[in-house]
Amino acid sequence: MHATRSRFPRGAVLAAVAVFSILSGAAHAADTLSVVTFGGAYETAAKKAWFEPFTAKTGVNFSLESYDGGLAKLNAMEQAKNPTWDLIDLETNDAITACDEGLLQKFDRKLLGNTSDFLPGSISDCAVSAMVWSTVYAYDTTKLTTPPTTINDFFDLKKFPGKRGMRKSPKVAMEWALIADGVAPKDVYKVLGTPAGVDRAFKKLDTIKSSIVWWDAGAQAPQLLADGAVVMTQAYNGRIDDAMHKDNKPFKIVWDAQVYDYEWWGIPAGAKHAADATKFIVAASTPQAYADLSKYIAYAPPRKDAIPLIDKKRLADLPTAPANFKRPLQINATFWADNADAINKRFQVWLTQ
Protein backbone atom coordinates (compact mmCIF):
# COMPACT_ATOMS: atom_id res chain seq x y z
CA MET A 1 0.00 0.00 0.00
CA HIS A 2 2.98 2.31 0.58
CA ALA A 3 4.57 3.40 -2.68
CA THR A 4 8.38 3.61 -2.86
CA ARG A 5 9.59 7.15 -3.22
CA SER A 6 12.68 9.31 -2.59
CA ARG A 7 13.37 10.49 0.94
CA PHE A 8 12.41 14.07 0.22
CA PRO A 9 9.86 13.97 -2.63
CA ARG A 10 8.96 17.31 -4.15
CA GLY A 11 5.26 16.83 -3.26
CA ALA A 12 6.08 16.24 0.38
CA VAL A 13 8.25 19.35 0.50
CA LEU A 14 5.49 21.42 -1.07
CA ALA A 15 2.98 19.95 1.38
CA ALA A 16 5.25 20.82 4.29
CA VAL A 17 5.66 24.37 3.00
CA ALA A 18 1.89 24.66 2.58
CA VAL A 19 1.25 23.45 6.12
CA PHE A 20 3.94 25.73 7.56
CA SER A 21 2.76 28.79 5.68
CA ILE A 22 -0.88 28.26 6.48
CA LEU A 23 -0.17 27.69 10.17
CA SER A 24 2.20 30.63 10.39
CA GLY A 25 -0.77 32.98 10.30
CA ALA A 26 -1.59 32.01 13.90
CA ALA A 27 -1.10 35.57 15.08
CA HIS A 28 -4.24 36.50 13.16
CA ALA A 29 -6.20 33.41 14.20
CA ALA A 30 -9.65 33.39 15.73
CA ASP A 31 -9.74 32.79 19.47
CA THR A 32 -12.18 29.91 19.10
CA LEU A 33 -13.47 27.67 16.33
CA SER A 34 -17.02 26.38 16.72
CA VAL A 35 -17.01 22.71 15.70
CA VAL A 36 -19.86 20.20 15.51
CA THR A 37 -19.09 16.47 15.56
CA PHE A 38 -20.84 13.17 16.24
CA GLY A 39 -19.46 13.34 19.78
CA GLY A 40 -18.55 10.42 22.01
CA ALA A 41 -15.35 8.43 21.65
CA TYR A 42 -14.59 9.92 18.22
CA GLU A 43 -14.72 13.47 19.55
CA THR A 44 -12.49 12.46 22.48
CA ALA A 45 -9.98 10.95 20.06
CA ALA A 46 -10.12 14.03 17.83
CA LYS A 47 -9.34 16.23 20.83
CA LYS A 48 -6.17 14.28 21.58
CA ALA A 49 -5.01 13.73 18.01
CA TRP A 50 -6.01 17.02 16.39
CA PHE A 51 -7.68 19.73 18.49
CA GLU A 52 -5.21 19.92 21.38
CA PRO A 53 -2.08 19.86 19.15
CA PHE A 54 -3.60 22.53 16.90
CA THR A 55 -4.36 24.73 19.90
CA ALA A 56 -0.80 24.28 21.15
CA LYS A 57 0.62 25.36 17.77
CA THR A 58 -1.75 28.20 16.91
CA GLY A 59 -3.47 29.37 20.08
CA VAL A 60 -6.86 28.64 18.50
CA ASN A 61 -9.29 26.93 20.88
CA PHE A 62 -12.31 24.81 20.03
CA SER A 63 -15.92 25.07 21.13
CA LEU A 64 -17.43 21.62 20.57
CA GLU A 65 -21.03 20.66 19.93
CA SER A 66 -22.49 17.20 19.23
CA TYR A 67 -25.21 16.23 16.76
CA ASP A 68 -26.65 13.09 15.15
CA GLY A 69 -26.01 14.06 11.54
CA GLY A 70 -28.29 15.48 8.89
CA LEU A 71 -28.44 18.94 7.34
CA ALA A 72 -31.48 20.50 9.02
CA LYS A 73 -29.55 22.90 11.23
CA LEU A 74 -27.03 23.74 8.51
CA ASN A 75 -29.93 24.54 6.19
CA ALA A 76 -31.52 26.75 8.84
CA MET A 77 -28.25 28.65 9.32
CA GLU A 78 -27.94 29.20 5.58
CA GLN A 79 -31.51 30.48 5.29
CA ALA A 80 -30.96 32.85 8.21
CA LYS A 81 -27.56 33.86 6.80
CA ASN A 82 -26.16 33.38 10.29
CA PRO A 83 -23.78 30.41 10.43
CA THR A 84 -22.71 29.69 14.01
CA TRP A 85 -20.48 26.74 13.11
CA ASP A 86 -17.01 27.07 11.62
CA LEU A 87 -16.39 23.38 10.98
CA ILE A 88 -18.74 20.43 10.59
CA ASP A 89 -18.24 16.66 10.78
CA LEU A 90 -20.24 15.01 7.97
CA GLU A 91 -21.20 11.62 6.60
CA THR A 92 -20.58 11.25 2.88
CA ASN A 93 -24.11 11.62 1.54
CA ASP A 94 -24.59 14.77 3.64
CA ALA A 95 -21.24 16.13 2.42
CA ILE A 96 -22.34 15.59 -1.19
CA THR A 97 -25.76 17.17 -0.69
CA ALA A 98 -24.39 20.08 1.34
CA CYS A 99 -21.83 20.85 -1.36
CA ASP A 100 -24.40 20.59 -4.16
CA GLU A 101 -26.80 22.90 -2.32
CA GLY A 102 -24.19 25.53 -1.50
CA LEU A 103 -24.22 24.86 2.24
CA LEU A 104 -20.44 24.36 2.32
CA GLN A 105 -17.72 26.60 0.99
CA LYS A 106 -15.34 25.24 -1.64
CA PHE A 107 -12.05 23.75 -0.46
CA ASP A 108 -8.81 24.38 -2.35
CA ARG A 109 -7.19 20.95 -2.53
CA LYS A 110 -3.90 22.53 -3.58
CA LEU A 111 -3.44 23.48 0.08
CA LEU A 112 -2.93 19.77 0.84
CA GLY A 113 0.16 19.55 -1.37
CA ASN A 114 0.76 16.15 -2.99
CA THR A 115 -2.48 14.19 -2.69
CA SER A 116 -1.51 11.12 -4.74
CA ASP A 117 -1.65 8.82 -1.69
CA PHE A 118 -5.20 9.79 -0.70
CA LEU A 119 -7.70 6.98 -1.20
CA PRO A 120 -10.03 7.38 -4.21
CA GLY A 121 -12.83 9.82 -3.58
CA SER A 122 -11.52 11.04 -0.23
CA ILE A 123 -11.22 14.69 -1.30
CA SER A 124 -14.21 16.53 -2.72
CA ASP A 125 -14.85 20.05 -3.96
CA CYS A 126 -16.06 21.11 -0.50
CA ALA A 127 -14.65 18.64 2.03
CA VAL A 128 -11.72 16.45 3.03
CA SER A 129 -12.01 13.00 4.54
CA ALA A 130 -11.16 12.79 8.23
CA MET A 131 -11.05 8.99 8.48
CA VAL A 132 -12.53 5.68 7.34
CA TRP A 133 -15.10 4.21 9.72
CA SER A 134 -17.41 1.25 9.63
CA THR A 135 -20.83 0.19 10.84
CA VAL A 136 -20.61 -3.31 12.28
CA TYR A 137 -22.46 -5.31 14.88
CA ALA A 138 -21.12 -6.48 18.20
CA TYR A 139 -22.12 -8.79 21.02
CA ASP A 140 -21.24 -9.51 24.65
CA THR A 141 -19.13 -12.67 24.77
CA THR A 142 -20.35 -13.45 28.29
CA LYS A 143 -24.00 -13.50 27.17
CA LEU A 144 -23.85 -15.71 24.07
CA THR A 145 -22.51 -19.27 24.30
CA THR A 146 -22.50 -19.67 20.50
CA PRO A 147 -20.78 -16.73 18.80
CA PRO A 148 -22.54 -15.10 15.83
CA THR A 149 -20.29 -14.78 12.79
CA THR A 150 -22.39 -13.45 9.90
CA ILE A 151 -24.97 -10.79 9.20
CA ASN A 152 -27.49 -13.62 8.82
CA ASP A 153 -27.01 -14.37 12.52
CA PHE A 154 -28.06 -10.82 13.39
CA PHE A 155 -31.42 -11.54 11.76
CA ASP A 156 -31.77 -15.06 13.21
CA LEU A 157 -33.96 -14.70 16.31
CA LYS A 158 -34.42 -18.45 16.62
CA LYS A 159 -30.72 -19.28 16.86
CA PHE A 160 -29.85 -16.06 18.72
CA PRO A 161 -32.92 -14.91 20.68
CA GLY A 162 -32.91 -11.48 22.26
CA LYS A 163 -33.06 -7.78 21.49
CA ARG A 164 -31.06 -6.11 18.73
CA GLY A 165 -29.79 -2.55 18.90
CA MET A 166 -30.01 -0.54 15.67
CA ARG A 167 -29.53 3.07 14.69
CA LYS A 168 -32.88 4.68 13.99
CA SER A 169 -32.13 5.15 10.31
CA PRO A 170 -32.80 3.18 7.13
CA LYS A 171 -29.19 3.64 6.07
CA VAL A 172 -27.24 0.40 6.67
CA ALA A 173 -30.40 -1.27 8.00
CA MET A 174 -31.67 -1.61 4.42
CA GLU A 175 -28.33 -2.83 3.10
CA TRP A 176 -27.97 -5.41 5.87
CA ALA A 177 -31.51 -6.65 5.35
CA LEU A 178 -30.83 -7.36 1.69
CA ILE A 179 -27.49 -9.06 2.34
CA ALA A 180 -29.09 -11.21 5.04
CA ASP A 181 -31.80 -12.06 2.52
CA GLY A 182 -29.25 -13.39 0.05
CA VAL A 183 -28.23 -10.37 -2.03
CA ALA A 184 -24.49 -10.19 -2.75
CA PRO A 185 -22.88 -6.98 -1.44
CA LYS A 186 -21.93 -5.96 -4.99
CA ASP A 187 -25.60 -6.08 -6.01
CA VAL A 188 -27.12 -4.34 -3.00
CA TYR A 189 -27.64 -0.90 -4.53
CA LYS A 190 -28.82 -2.33 -7.83
CA VAL A 191 -31.56 -4.15 -5.91
CA LEU A 192 -32.24 -1.32 -3.46
CA GLY A 193 -32.67 1.04 -6.39
CA THR A 194 -35.92 -0.71 -7.35
CA PRO A 195 -39.32 -0.55 -5.62
CA ALA A 196 -39.24 -4.34 -5.27
CA GLY A 197 -35.83 -4.11 -3.60
CA VAL A 198 -37.06 -1.56 -1.08
CA ASP A 199 -40.06 -3.78 -0.34
CA ARG A 200 -37.74 -6.75 0.10
CA ALA A 201 -35.54 -4.90 2.58
CA PHE A 202 -38.50 -3.79 4.71
CA LYS A 203 -39.92 -7.31 4.62
CA LYS A 204 -36.64 -8.67 6.01
CA LEU A 205 -36.54 -5.96 8.68
CA ASP A 206 -40.08 -6.99 9.63
CA THR A 207 -38.67 -10.33 10.81
CA ILE A 208 -36.78 -8.65 13.68
CA LYS A 209 -38.77 -5.43 14.09
CA SER A 210 -40.39 -6.46 17.40
CA SER A 211 -36.94 -7.20 18.86
CA ILE A 212 -35.23 -3.95 17.84
CA VAL A 213 -34.14 -1.35 20.39
CA TRP A 214 -33.48 1.85 18.46
CA TRP A 215 -30.65 4.25 19.24
CA ASP A 216 -29.84 7.73 17.93
CA ALA A 217 -26.39 8.69 19.24
CA GLY A 218 -23.40 6.44 18.63
CA ALA A 219 -22.50 6.34 22.32
CA GLN A 220 -25.80 4.59 23.06
CA ALA A 221 -24.87 1.40 21.19
CA PRO A 222 -22.09 0.13 23.51
CA GLN A 223 -24.13 1.30 26.50
CA LEU A 224 -27.11 -0.82 25.43
CA LEU A 225 -24.79 -3.81 25.20
CA ALA A 226 -23.15 -3.08 28.55
CA ASP A 227 -26.53 -2.69 30.25
CA GLY A 228 -27.77 -6.00 28.87
CA ALA A 229 -30.63 -4.25 27.08
CA VAL A 230 -29.67 -6.05 23.86
CA VAL A 231 -27.73 -9.23 23.05
CA MET A 232 -26.16 -7.66 19.97
CA THR A 233 -26.15 -4.21 18.45
CA GLN A 234 -25.36 -2.33 15.31
CA ALA A 235 -22.58 0.12 16.17
CA TYR A 236 -19.73 2.23 14.87
CA ASN A 237 -16.61 0.10 15.06
CA GLY A 238 -14.62 2.76 16.90
CA ARG A 239 -17.18 2.99 19.71
CA ILE A 240 -17.06 -0.77 20.33
CA ASP A 241 -13.27 -0.90 20.09
CA ASP A 242 -13.09 1.95 22.60
CA ALA A 243 -15.33 0.05 25.03
CA MET A 244 -13.26 -3.11 24.59
CA HIS A 245 -9.82 -1.58 25.05
CA LYS A 246 -10.45 1.34 27.39
CA ASP A 247 -13.36 0.06 29.46
CA ASN A 248 -12.41 -3.64 29.27
CA LYS A 249 -15.88 -4.65 28.08
CA PRO A 250 -16.18 -8.30 26.94
CA PHE A 251 -17.46 -7.32 23.50
CA LYS A 252 -16.60 -8.77 20.11
CA ILE A 253 -17.08 -7.23 16.69
CA VAL A 254 -18.57 -9.19 13.80
CA TRP A 255 -17.02 -7.74 10.64
CA ASP A 256 -19.12 -9.65 8.11
CA ALA A 257 -21.02 -7.23 5.87
CA GLN A 258 -19.43 -4.21 7.53
CA VAL A 259 -20.59 -1.03 5.82
CA TYR A 260 -17.72 1.42 5.60
CA ASP A 261 -17.59 5.07 4.70
CA TYR A 262 -15.51 8.20 4.89
CA GLU A 263 -16.11 10.87 7.50
CA TRP A 264 -15.59 14.44 6.31
CA TRP A 265 -14.58 17.90 7.46
CA GLY A 266 -16.50 20.72 5.78
CA ILE A 267 -16.72 24.46 6.36
CA PRO A 268 -20.23 25.99 6.35
CA ALA A 269 -20.77 28.66 3.72
CA GLY A 270 -20.27 32.06 5.31
CA ALA A 271 -18.48 30.65 8.37
CA LYS A 272 -17.09 33.48 10.48
CA HIS A 273 -13.70 31.83 10.96
CA ALA A 274 -13.37 29.99 7.65
CA ALA A 275 -9.68 30.81 7.25
CA ASP A 276 -8.77 29.20 10.56
CA ALA A 277 -11.05 26.24 9.87
CA THR A 278 -9.15 25.75 6.62
CA LYS A 279 -5.84 25.81 8.50
CA PHE A 280 -7.17 23.14 10.82
CA ILE A 281 -8.25 20.86 7.98
CA VAL A 282 -4.81 21.14 6.39
CA ALA A 283 -3.09 20.35 9.71
CA ALA A 284 -5.39 17.38 10.39
CA SER A 285 -4.88 15.91 6.92
CA THR A 286 -1.19 15.05 7.08
CA PRO A 287 -0.17 11.36 7.21
CA GLN A 288 1.05 11.79 10.79
CA ALA A 289 -2.17 13.47 11.90
CA TYR A 290 -4.23 10.62 10.45
CA ALA A 291 -1.97 8.06 12.12
CA ASP A 292 -2.32 9.91 15.42
CA LEU A 293 -6.11 9.53 15.32
CA SER A 294 -5.78 5.76 14.99
CA LYS A 295 -3.88 5.69 18.30
CA TYR A 296 -6.98 6.85 20.11
CA ILE A 297 -9.82 5.22 18.15
CA ALA A 298 -9.95 2.36 15.64
CA TYR A 299 -10.72 4.38 12.53
CA ALA A 300 -8.51 4.05 9.48
CA PRO A 301 -6.65 6.83 7.64
CA PRO A 302 -7.75 7.89 4.14
CA ARG A 303 -4.07 8.30 3.17
CA LYS A 304 -1.82 5.36 2.27
CA ASP A 305 1.27 7.17 3.58
CA ALA A 306 -0.22 7.10 7.09
CA ILE A 307 -0.25 3.29 7.23
CA PRO A 308 3.50 2.78 7.98
CA LEU A 309 3.15 5.28 10.85
CA ILE A 310 0.58 3.12 12.69
CA ASP A 311 1.56 0.36 15.11
CA LYS A 312 1.08 -3.06 13.48
CA LYS A 313 -0.99 -4.34 16.38
CA ARG A 314 -3.28 -1.35 16.05
CA LEU A 315 -3.65 -1.88 12.31
CA ALA A 316 -5.40 -5.19 13.04
CA ASP A 317 -8.23 -3.29 14.78
CA LEU A 318 -9.01 -1.07 11.81
CA PRO A 319 -11.91 -1.63 9.39
CA THR A 320 -9.51 -1.96 6.46
CA ALA A 321 -7.37 -4.73 8.02
CA PRO A 322 -7.41 -7.75 5.64
CA ALA A 323 -8.98 -10.08 8.22
CA ASN A 324 -11.81 -7.59 8.76
CA PHE A 325 -12.32 -6.71 5.12
CA LYS A 326 -13.47 -10.04 3.65
CA ARG A 327 -17.07 -9.10 2.75
CA PRO A 328 -17.39 -5.34 3.10
CA LEU A 329 -19.79 -2.92 1.49
CA GLN A 330 -18.89 0.69 0.84
CA ILE A 331 -21.84 2.96 1.45
CA ASN A 332 -23.15 4.34 -1.83
CA ALA A 333 -23.34 7.98 -0.87
CA THR A 334 -24.76 9.07 -4.22
CA PHE A 335 -27.61 6.57 -3.82
CA TRP A 336 -28.45 7.94 -0.39
CA ALA A 337 -28.08 11.56 -1.48
CA ASP A 338 -30.64 10.87 -4.23
CA ASN A 339 -32.99 8.56 -2.32
CA ALA A 340 -32.71 9.43 1.37
CA ASP A 341 -35.83 11.61 1.51
CA ALA A 342 -38.14 9.02 -0.05
CA ILE A 343 -36.78 6.06 1.90
CA ASN A 344 -36.70 8.04 5.16
CA LYS A 345 -40.37 8.94 4.75
CA ARG A 346 -41.29 5.30 4.28
CA PHE A 347 -39.04 4.30 7.19
CA GLN A 348 -40.78 6.74 9.52
CA VAL A 349 -44.17 5.32 8.54
CA TRP A 350 -42.84 1.77 8.96
CA LEU A 351 -41.68 2.58 12.50
CA THR A 352 -45.24 3.43 13.53
CA GLN A 353 -46.90 0.40 11.95
What kind of feature is each model-predicted range?
Residues F325-Q353:
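Conserved C-terminal helix/tail region of periplasmic/extracytoplasmic solute-binding proteins
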Residues G40-A45, P83-W85, L90-A226:
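Extracytoplasmic ligand-binding site segments that recognize negatively charged/polar headgroups
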Residues A95-T97, M232-P250:
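A ligand-binding cleft/hinge motif common to bilobed small-molecule-binding domains
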Residues H2-L14:
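Bacterial N-terminal signal peptides that target proteins for export
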Residues A30-A98:
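Early extracytoplasmic/lumenal segment of secretory-pathway proteins
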Residues E263, P268-P328:
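Mature extracytoplasmic/periplasmic domains
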Residues L23-A29:
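Sec/Tat signal peptide C-region and signal peptidase I cleavage site
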Residues D117, W133-T135, V198-T207, H245-A271, ...:
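Periplasmic-binding protein-like
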